[in-house]
Swiss-Prot record:
This is Serine/threonine-protein kinase SSN3. It comes from Coccidioides immitis (strain RS). It is an enzyme of class 2 (transferase). InterPro entries: CDK (IPR050108), Kinase-like_dom_sf (IPR011009), Prot_kinase_dom (IPR000719), Ser/Thr_kinase_AS (IPR008271). SMART domains: S_TKc. The active site is at 211 (proton acceptor). The gene is SSN3.
C-alpha cells in the first residue's frame, strides 16, 4: 500500500506553500476529495497521480474524538495514570488509559505554573502553553499529533493527546545498539514523506513549527508519523509582532537554519525545511549531520553568535557566497561570518561543498545499495537532501515541492506504514513508575522563554540511559 504523489508545483510563490486560507487542509485522500470535510480535503490546485486509499486509514478508520475544554472533569475519574514518560521546561508527560468507555492509551501533558521569584504564583499560562493549546485545538491532520481534550483542575492545565509508542530519536538510537545497522531505505522514505506531508498541512494553515527534531517526530505502533510538540509553533500570517521579537531563539541548535544562526529578524517556513533536511541526514547516518556546541546567553540575555554551529555547517557545505545568496550580506551576523572566513587557519573553510562526498560515505558505511535488503535512497535522495540544505532560504525547496520530488515519485512507492516490510521490532516507550507526581496539585514553577532547557544533547543522553 502506498501514498499518492502530489503533482509538480506550478511555482514557488511564498513559503506558505500556496496557502490561501484555513479551510482546506491539503492532504491526499482517496480518488476524490471533499473540500467541506477537513478530514478528506485537499488544496484546490493539487491533483492525484496515483489512486490510493484514504489517509484517514492511518487513523484506523476512527473519527477524531470531539475536542472539548473540560473544566469540571476530574482527570483521575476519566483516565488511569499508568506512569511517567518524560519532563521538560513546560512540565511533565504521563501515559494514561481511558476509563469508563474512553478506550485507548493517551499521553497527558501537565503544565507547570509560571513563577514570580522563588515562590510559585499562579499567574496564568505561559505563552508557549497558550499557543500549543490554541493551535492543537484547530489543527486536524493524520500527520500532526491529535489533541483529545484540555482539562483544568486544581490550577493545573492538562493536555490529553493520542498516545504514540515511538519517536525518531528512539528509533535512531535503536539502530545504533548493540552495533550500527541502517534504517531501511523504504522506511526512511515513508517517514520523510509523512513528515513533509504534515508540514505541508501546517504551512498551508499558516503555522510554522520552529522546533522540528527527531524527538518531536512521533510514530505510532502502526507506522503513522505525527508531528508533535507545537510549543514553539507560530501563526505567521499577519502576526501582531515580528517573529524575532516574540521568540529570539527558535529551533534546537543542531537543526537551526543558517539564516537563524546569522541573526535574521524575519524568516519564513524555510527554517522548517532546513530542519527536515537535518532529520533526513540523521536518519541515514544515525548521527546529527551538524553537531555543534551551543553558546549560551549571557546574564543580559543577549543572543550570542553560534560560531561553532555555523562552523559545523561550513565544514560540510562550504562557506555561503553572496553570489548564490543575495541576502547574505544584510544578515546581522554577516560580519561575524566574514571574521571566521578571514581568521588565521581558516583555509579549510574555503573548500567547496563536501555534501555529496558525505552522502556517499554515509550510504557506503550504512550498507545502502540497490541490491541490499535495506535498499538505497540513490541519487534522488542526494538531490532532495541538497535542496533541503540550501543556504538561501528563498531557494530552499518547499514542502509541496519536496513531496513532488523524484525521490518520492519514482522507484518503490511510498509505504503508508513506515514499518511495512521491517522484520525487526522497536522497543515500547519507557514508562516509569518513579517521579510520578501527576496526583499532586503543584509542580516547581517555570517560565519558558525560547527553547526548552533540556536541549537535544541532554535529552539524548537521558534517553540513552533509560533505554
Amino acid at each position: 500500500m502506498s501514498f499518492s504523489n502530489l503533482p509538480p508545483s506550478s511555482g514557488r510563490g511564498s513559503h506558505a506553500d500556496g496557502a490561501s486560507g484555513r479551510s482546506m487542509p491539503p492532504f491526499p485522500g482517496s480518488s476524490s476529495f471533499t473540500a467541506n470535510n477537513p478530514s478528506k480535503g485537499i488544496h484546490p490546485n493539487l491533483t492525484l497521480k496515483r489512486s490510493v486509499q484514504s489517509f484517514d486509514e492511518s487513523l484506523d478508520n476512527k473519527k477524531p474524538l470531539p475536542f472539548s475544554y473540560a473544566s469540571k472533569v476530574k482527570l483521575r475519574e476519566k483516565y488511569l495514570i499508568v506512569g511517567f514518560i518524560s519532563s521538560g521546561t513546560y512540565g511533565r508527560v504521563y501515559k494514561a488509559k481511558g476509563r469508563d468507555g474512553v478506550g485507548g492509551d493517551f499521553a497527558i501533558k501537565k503544565f507547570k505554573p509560571d513563577k514570580e521569584g522563588e515562590k510559585v504564583e499562579y499567574t496564568g499560562l505561559s505563552q508557549s502553553a497558550i499557543r500549543e493549546i490554541s493551535l492543537c485545538t484547530e489543527l486536524n491532520h493524520p500527520n500532526v499529533v491529535r489533541l483529545v481534550e484540555t482539562i483544568l483542575e486544581d490550577k493545573c492545565v492538562y493536555m490529553v493527546f493520542e498516545y504514540t509508542e515511538h519517536d525518531l530519536l528512539q528509533i535512531i538510537h535503536h539502530h545504533t545498539q548493540p552495533q550500527r545497522h541502517a534504517i531501511p531505505a523504504p522506511m526512511v522514505k515513508s517517514i520523510l514523506f509523512q513528515l513533509l506531508n504534515g508540514l505541508l498541512y501546517l504551512h498551508s494553515q499558516w503555522v510554522m513549527h520552529r522546533d522540528l527534531k527527531p524527538a518531536n517526530i512521533l510514530v505510532t505502533s502502526k507506522g503513522a508519523v505525527r508531528i508533535g510538540d507545537l510549543g514553539l509553533a507560530r501563526v505567521f500570517k499577519k502576526p501582531l509582532n515580528s517573529l524575532f521579537s516574540g521568540d529570539k531563539v527558535v529551533v534546537t541548535i543542531w537543526y537551526r537554519a543558517p539564516e537563524l544562526l546569522l541573526g535574521a529578524r524575519h524568516y519564513t517556513t524555510a527554517v522548517d525545511l532546513w530542519a527536515v533536511g537535518c532529520i533526513f541526514a540523521e536518519l541515514l547516518s544515525l548521527r546529527p549531520i551538524f553537531k555543534g556546541e551551543e553558546a549560551k546567553m549571557d546574564s543580559k540575555k543577549t543572543v550570542p553568535f553560534q560560531r561553532n554551529q555555523m562552523l559545523k555547517i561550513i565544514e560540510i557545505l562550504g562557506l555561503p557566497k553572496k553570489e548564490k545568496w543575495p541576502g547574505l550580506s544584510s544578515m546581522p551576523e554577516f560580519p561575524q561570518l566574514q571574521a571566521m572566513a578571514m581568521a588565521p587557519g581558516s583555509g579549510h573553510l574555503h573548500k567547496p561543498s563536501n555534501l555529496e562526498h558525505w552522502y556517499h560515505v554515509c550510504l557506503k558505511s550504512g550498507g545502502y545499495s540497490g541490491s541490499s535488503p535495506a535498499g538505497s535512497p540513490g541519487k534522488e535522495g542526494f538531490d532532495l537532501l541538497s535542496r533541503l540544505l540550501e543556504y538561501d532560504p528563498e531557494k530552499r525547496i518547499s514542502a509541496k515541492e519536496a513531496l513532488n520530488h523524484p525521490y518520492f515519485t519514482t522507484g518503490t512507492p511510498v509505504a503508508k506504514n513506515c514499518f511495512e516490510g521491517f522484520e525487526g521490532k522497536y522497543p515500547n516507550r519507557r514508562v516509569s513508575q518513579d517521579d510520578n507526581d501527576i496526583r499532586s496539585g503543584s509542580l516547581p514553577g517555570t517560565k519558558r522563554s525560547g527553547l526548552p532547557d533540556d536541549t537535544l544533547t541532554s535529552r539524548a543522553a537521558k534517553r540513552a540511559r533509560e533505554m
